[in-house]
Amino acid sequence: VLAGALLHDVGKLKEISPDMGFPYTTGGRLLGHITITVMMVSEAAAKLGSIDEKKLQQLLHIILSHHGEQDKGSPVACATKEGFVVHYADEIDAIMNQFDVNNTEGTWEFNKMLQRYLYL
């Protein structure tokens, strides 16, 4: 779970450019951060050489399923408890970040992502 939590979005480092406005890279647009992450982790595992294949598959499943469902962008749906843990932790993190969109405390604001008013 810890490795999945730490690595699931590492592909964003290659998906998004550090240039002004943080545009997507060509590779980012063509492959997306999930595919890029799987490639990076697979390459690192191959360099290590002696990694347990079952553990690698479980880690790759966490990465591939961290958006939860295929209709939400995951190539595969969560099928392990570790996958669900990382998915829901990532989802809670995204929800909590919505409270930081507007820093005006004590106000109500409609949030398009969550489709509801939030009290800030």
PLM features per residue range, with description:
Residues 1, 87, 104-105, 109-120:
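N-terminal intrinsically disordered, cationic/polar leader segments
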